[in-house]
Design a protein with these regions (language model features):
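Extreme N-terminal starter segment of soluble prokaryotic enzymes
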Residues: 2-4
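Acetyl-CoA-dependent GNAT
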Residues: 7-13, 17-30, 38-101, 112-114, ...
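Conserved phosphate-binding and hydrolysis motifs of nucleotide-dependent enzymes
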Residues: 68, 72, 106-108, 146
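C-terminal "cap" of GNAT-fold acetyltransferases
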Residues: 87-91, 125-139, 143-145, 151-173
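Active-site acidic-Proline motif in GNAT/NAT acetyltransferases
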Residues: 99-101, 105, 133-134
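Conserved acetyl-CoA-binding loop-helix of GNAT-fold acetyltransferases
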Residues: 104-117, 140-144
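Short coil/turn segments at alpha/beta junctions that flank glycine-rich nucleotide-binding fingerprints
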Residues: 105, 122-125
Length: 173
């Protein structure tokens, strides 16, 4: 399966909103209340919010496309855009999401490899992320790619406080 990646701009806010809502709902709706999902999606995936994030020069978005269809996306943060204080030369993967129909077909791996390429281009000392403690598929994916746990933080999904495991992959610089 051939996966092509495309960097998004502010003009792509609607595309980003559609894939964000689709993948987030698919991934988390069964494990969270409808009210919390609706609140979170309304806050984090509004076109206005995503336009602001796309305009941030320290954040980068990429879609994964298969046969012209958007099937996943990646959000990277550097500097002050990182969601937790980290070293200035760290790179955060805030989001990698792939539609369930494309799990196991190399789409997530292609997005991660692109993050690794960006980290190397920026001479990042490490890549880090937060992953929900109950998202076992994601935990396995990151462990397979060399990430190890280094802490945890609270992630608010709507009104529900959840625990994210913080993971990092040192790039040995």
């Amino acid at each position: 399966m051939s996966v092509s990646l495309r960097e998004l701009t502010v003009a792509d806010a609607a595309v980003l909103r559609n894939i964000s809502i689709a993948t987030f709902t698919e991934t988390f709706a069964d494990s969270n209340s409808a009210a919390d999902m609706e609140l979170y999606i309304g806050q984090r995936f509004s076109e206005n919010q995503l336009t602001q994030e796309l305009a941030n020069p320290e954040s980068f978005f990429y879609t994964a496309e298969v046969q012209g269809q958007t099937v996943g996306y990646l959000k990277l943060n550097t500097g002050g855009a990182q969601t937790e204080p980290q070293q200035e030369n760290a790179l955060e993967i805030e989001r990698i999401y792939v539609l369930g129909t494309h799990h196991g077909h190399g789409v997530g791996q292609a997005l991660y490899q692109h993050a690794l390429t960006i980290a190397n281009q920026r001479a990042a000392s490490y890549i880090w992320l937060g992953v929900w403690e109950h998202n076992h598929r994601a935990l396995r994916f990151y462990q397979k790619n060399g990430f190890t746990a280094f802490g945890q933080h609270i992630f608010r999904l709507g009104n529900d406080e959840q625990t994210d495991i913080l993971m990092k992959h040192d790039l040995n610089r």
